[in-house]
């Protein structure tokens, strides 16, 4: 697993044409943030900003995970989503 593989997975995700659920988007987002920035380091968003709050909470779940582990999981999740793509 390398930085190049991670970047390729990031590019692949942008090319997906099939539907991706909000839950899947949040999960992939959380691993992307952990892989690129490490533990969540932003203030808690206001409860009124539902989207930002959901993203924050998803990222916080990965607290303590190494960037390399997050990259591996991100790549695996993107591969799962690619397999769901319509032919």
Curated annotation (Swiss-Prot):
InterPro entries: Acyl-CoA-binding_prot_CS, Acyl-CoA-binding_protein, Acyl-CoA-binding_sf, FERM/acyl-CoA-bd_prot_sf. Residues 2-87 form the ACB domain. An acyl-CoA binds at residues 29-33, 55, 74. GO terms for molecular function: fatty-acyl-CoA binding. It is found in: Cytoplasm. This is Diazepam-binding inhibitor-like 5. GO terms for cellular component: cytoplasm. It holds the Pfam family ACBP. May be involved in the energy metabolism of the mature sperm. Keywords: Cytoplasm, Lipid-binding, Transport. Its main location: cytoplasm. Exclusively expressed in late spermatids and spermatozoa. Not found in epididymis, spleen, bone marrow, skin, liver, brain, heart, kidney, muscle. The keyword Transport applies. Belongs to the ACBP family. It comes from Mus musculus (Mouse). GO terms for biological process: spermatogenesis.
């Amino acid at each position: 697993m390398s930085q190049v593989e991670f970047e390729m997975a990031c590019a692949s995700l942008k090319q997906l044409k099939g539907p991706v659920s909000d839950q899947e988007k949040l999960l992939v987002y959380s691993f992307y943030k952990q892989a690129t920035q490490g533990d969540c380091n932003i203030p808690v968003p206001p409860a009124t900003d539902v989207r930002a709050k959901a993203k924050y909470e998803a990222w916080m779940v990965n607290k303590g995970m190494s960037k390399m582990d997050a990259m591996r999981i991100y790549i695996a999740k993107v591969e799962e989503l690619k397999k769901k793509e319509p032919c």
